[in-house]
């Protein structure tokens, strides 16, 4: 997902923080 601040996936977490 895009807004995933509590994801276990590093890339997903970074994307969430950046977006």
Curated annotation (Swiss-Prot):
It is an enzyme of class 5 (isomerase). It comes from the Eukaryota. Keywords: Cytokine, Isomerase. Its EC number is 5.3.3.12. Induction: Inhibited by free fatty acids and haematin. The keyword Isomerase applies. It catalyses: L-dopachrome = 5,6-dihydroxyindole-2-carboxylate. GO terms for cellular component: extracellular space. One of its GO terms (molecular function) is dopachrome isomerase activity. The keyword Isomerase applies. Belongs to the MIF family. Tautomerization of the methyl ester of L-dopachrome. This is L-dopachrome-methyl ester tautomerase. It comes from Trichuris muris (Mouse whipworm). The lineage of its organism: Eukaryota, Metazoa, Ecdysozoa, Nematoda, Enoplea.
